[in-house]
Amino acid sequence: MGSLGEEVQVIIVGLGIVGLAAAIECREKGHSVHAFEKSNILKSIGDCIGLQSNATRIIKRWGDGAVHEALRPWIVSSKEIRIHNSSGRLIIRQDLSEVCEQPNYLLPRSELIRVMYEHALKIGVEISLGVEVCEPSEDEEGASVVALTRDGERQIVRGDFIICSDGVHSKMRKAIMPQPVEPRPSGYAAFRALVDTETLKGDPEASWVFEGVEENDRFDVFFLSGAQIALQSCNKGKVFSWFCIHQDTRNLLDVWTSPADPNEMLDLIKVWPIGQRLWSVIRHTQPQKFINYPLLNHKPLDHWVSSHGRLILIGDAAHPLSPAAGQGASQGIEDANVLATSLSLAGRQRVSLALHVAERIRYARASAVQLISHRVNEGWRNQDWDAYEPNEQNIASLPLETWIYGHDSQAYTEQEFEMVVRAVQEGEEYHATNLPDKLRVQLGIRNVDVKEPLQNKSP
């Protein structure tokens, strides 16, 4: 990078969905962005990803609506989530009409990354693929990293600050939290994949899964004590995906790419009364796309911002979520939006302040969703689903609450910015109102650690 201009110079490390969201948000709000990804190509494995309206209202602003138009075929048309026990008996119909009042998306992860990547390039984000980043450092004036290409070239890249969006195994996190952050094994893992729709169409035993999807996509969940399967269609039945949370009997490595044998899935569900019906769909997963990865429990970190206020963690690097919440990417997109908005309101001379403001606004809310996701999973595991009656406490329902999906993070940031600035500058706590107070107490959510008043430091 050349000499620093008037724009905020943003370095992003990690270009998954959240890193791309940060790149787009920062660039569309007038900042200069250089993003790095160690892979040569942007790719994603696994199944589909859902984005609720707390994220899609952010995406709808990108490119004056152009990104939303590209994603329009993937707007969720499901009217309900149907929850069943292992015999296939319908336990609960969870209405989605309020959740889907604003557009929600459900689409293959790879398709979302493609659309976001193309838009990022179009608006002028500088993207370096196949480049590993190391040695992050900061001072009161800015931050830098060392970029290592596959050809062995070593280059120091300097900017105003660094967004660390390099995932749950973040290497950048050490620069912010020197002590290692060790997740706790949950004892569970997840199979997940896309189904080969073309072969699925030709299987008469699987014809049931296409019923009604041209009008309303399917979202079915099946429970057995100790396991859970979700089966979804999107784009009016053009794509089917599934995932299964199950006991981890292999002590899997904590990576997304642990290979799996489809027969493991068959062994798991063949004892279910509904097992053969589900297998008629799942067997159409291509073996090379069949993955199995462990689910780990992560405590909220103490903080996300570095000592000089020039590095910030976002997304899974800051607050990994269990799949139960369906909010992993959506919360990361909120991070990106709040950070970019805070930068625009603060200006280049107050970059460190902007990072602390974004952390204060997001910390309690993201921590609450993180803890809820773990608690919901634990509740599911301890329930006797075959004995479950619909009039019991509705523990089967997914956490689809208005305070989560109805939130407008940009409007909230613009409204609260000056109040948070005062709290940061005076070294006081900021009590965020973007989560319910009652829930904050129930979950034991605290505010982010209060540091030395920022006004006593250099900008």
From Swiss-Prot:
<dbReference type="Pfam" id="PF01494">
    <property type="entry name" value="FAD_binding_3"/>
</dbReference>
<feature type="binding site">
    <location>
        <position position="18"/>
    </location>
    <ligand>
        <name>FAD</name>
    </ligand>
</feature>
<keyword id="KW-0503">Monooxygenase</keyword>
<comment type="similarity">
    <text>Belongs to the paxM FAD-dependent monooxygenase family.</text>
</comment>
<feature type="active site">
    <location>
        <position position="192"/>
    </location>
</feature>
<feature type="binding site">
    <location>
        <position position="109"/>
    </location>
    <ligand>
        <name>FAD</name>
    </ligand>
</feature>
<keyword id="KW-0560">Oxidoreductase</keyword>
<dbReference type="InterPro" id="IPR036188">
    <property type="entry name" value="FAD/NAD-bd_sf"/>
</dbReference>
<dbReference type="InterPro" id="IPR002938">
    <property type="entry name" value="FAD-bd"/>
</dbReference>
<feature type="binding site">
    <location>
        <position position="133"/>
    </location>
    <ligand>
        <name>FAD</name>
    </ligand>
</feature>
<dbReference type="GO" id="GO:0071949">
    <property type="term" value="F:FAD binding"/>
</dbReference>
<feature type="binding site">
    <location>
        <position position="316"/>
    </location>
    <ligand>
        <name>FAD</name>
    </ligand>
</feature>
<comment type="pathway">
    <text>Alkaloid biosynthesis.</text>
</comment>
<keyword id="KW-0285">Flavoprotein</keyword>
<keyword id="KW-0274">FAD</keyword>
<dbReference type="InterPro" id="IPR050493">
    <property type="entry name" value="FAD-dep_Monooxygenase_BioMet"/>
</dbReference>
<protein>
    <recommendedName>
        <fullName>FAD-dependent monooxygenase phqK</fullName>
        <ecNumber>1.-.-.-</ecNumber>
    </recommendedName>
</protein>
<comment type="function">
    <text>FAD-dependent monooxygenase; part of the gene cluster that mediates the biosynthesis of paraherquamide, a fungal indole alkaloid that belongs to a family of natural products containing a characteristic bicyclo[2.2.2]diazaoctane core. Within the pathway, phqK catalyzes spirocycle formation through two parallel pathways in the biosynthesis of paraherquamides A and G, using as substrates paraherquamides K and L, with paraherquamide L, bearing the dioxepin, being likely the favored substrate.</text>
</comment>
<feature type="binding site">
    <location>
        <position position="50"/>
    </location>
    <ligand>
        <name>FAD</name>
    </ligand>
</feature>
<comment type="pathway">
    <text>Secondary metabolite biosynthesis.</text>
</comment>
<feature type="binding site">
    <location>
        <position position="37"/>
    </location>
    <ligand>
        <name>FAD</name>
    </ligand>
</feature>
<dbReference type="GO" id="GO:0004497">
    <property type="term" value="F:monooxygenase activity"/>
</dbReference>
<feature type="binding site">
    <location>
        <position position="47"/>
    </location>
    <ligand>
        <name>FAD</name>
    </ligand>
</feature>
<feature type="active site">
    <location>
        <position position="232"/>
    </location>
</feature>
